From Swiss-Prot:
It catalyses: a plastoquinone + NADH + (n+1) H(+)(in) = a plastoquinol + NAD(+) + n H(+)(out); a plastoquinone + NADPH + (n+1) H(+)(in) = a plastoquinol + NADP(+) + n H(+)(out). Belongs to the complex I NdhN subunit family. This is NAD(P)H-quinone oxidoreductase subunit N. It is a peripheral membrane protein. The lineage of its organism: Bacteria, Bacillati, Cyanobacteriota, Cyanophyceae, Synechococcales. The keyword Metal-binding does not apply.
């Protein structure tokens, strides 16, 4: 990997494909460099982990309920057998206020199933301002490819 990475080719590929699969060096640093270049180019960015994502469209765009972790002995008479449900704001709702492209950078993307990755690709096709970068594991050098190529679609 060159010392100075301008990010121009990465931005062009991201705009063309919408959803990219990345393999990054395990020592890190290259993804934050690309995020900084994207922010400087006018993109809004959101860095998140893919673990516990669930349904991508609901998690990212709609008000949804979650159940907090069980912290020991608590009264079940208060909330019933299913437990307490808390409403959570969507992750990307406040980033779509202007006509600025938004990049969602998902760490640990290797835990996502094929159907979840396809749902992310479809989400990028439906929402023209959304770009998704999924880190699919480690590599000796920084490389990326369209998610549709990785999935064989």
């Amino acid at each position: 990997m060159p010392l100075l990475l301008s990010g121009r080719v990465f931005r062009r590929d991201l705009d063309a494909c919408g959803c990219l699969a990345m393999h990054v060096p395990l020592e890190g640093g290259s993804e934050t460099r690309l995020l900084r270049r994207l922010r400087a180019a006018g993109y809004r960015t959101q860095l998140s982990s893919a673990r516990g994502l669930g349904d991508p469209e609901v998690f990212l765009f709609q008000l949804h309920g979650i159940r907090p972790p069980h912290l020991g002995h608590q009264s079940v008479g208060r909330n019933g057998a299913v437990g307490e449900v808390q409403q959570v704001m969507p992750q990307l709702a406040e980033l779509f206020v202007d006509n600025v492209p938004v990049v969602l950078w998902l760490l640990e993307g290797q835990v996502l199933s094929r159907s979840e990755l396809l749902a992310l690709c479809d989400l990028c096709k439906r929402e023209s301002r959304l770009r998704v970068v999924v880190e699919m594991g480690g590599a000796r050098s920084l490389n990326w490819q369209p998610m549709s190529t990785l999935l064989g679609v």
